[in-house]
Amino acid sequence: MSKRTEQLTELLAPVVEDLGFVLWGVEYIQGRGAVLRVFIDHADGISVDDCAAVSHEVSGVLDVEDPIPGEFNLEVSSPGMDRPMFDITQYVDYIGEDVQLKLLAPVSGKRKMTAAIVAVDGDTLVVELDGETLRVPYSQVDRARLQPRFN
């Protein structure tokens, strides 16, 4: 997680939580047409009205604090079924599910894989790929997204 993303998460988490939601994660994409994506979650799901309420409050905080120079688009949404993963603690609730990983350095010769989440062991993600158990240091995870199964 970049320093800016960490700062935005720290700034926005209390706002989102005060509205009764969980801040699932924050993505900031720089450049022309910059985008700040705020993912919110709730045990009862997320509605369009929920996103609008959070967007309104987050916009106010961003206007006052001004943590991002220049113009950007704010997007507030549910993380969805194929949710991006932002923190190692989020994996615990999805043990047994598949996750698509993009790694900074190869593990067992692979930088990209879809594997089943077996466990979280401190700062290590334990996954199973083709019958082999792999220990992936979380510091090596560049991107991760749940891969829902449809039976």
Curated annotation (Swiss-Prot):
InterPro entries: Ribosome_maturation_RimP, RimP_C, RimP_C_sf, RimP_N, RimP_N_sf
CDD domains in the cross-refs: YlxS_C
Keywords in alphabetical order: Cytoplasm, Ribosome biogenesis
Pfam family, one: RimP_N
SUPFAM superfamilies noted in UniProt: YhbC-like, C-terminal domain, YhbC-like, N-terminal domain
Compartment(s) where it occurs, according to its Swiss-Prot or TrEMBL record: Cytoplasm
Principal location class: cytoplasm
Keyword Cytoplasm attached: yes
GO cellular component: cytosol
Gene Ontology BP terms: ribosomal small subunit assembly; translation
HAMAP family, alphabetized: RimP
Record family assignment: Belongs to the RimP family.
Function comment: Required for maturation of 30S ribosomal subunits.
Name assigned to this protein: Ribosome maturation factor RimP
Source organism of this protein record: Alcanivorax borkumensis (strain ATCC 700651 / DSM 11573 / NCIMB 13689 / SK2)
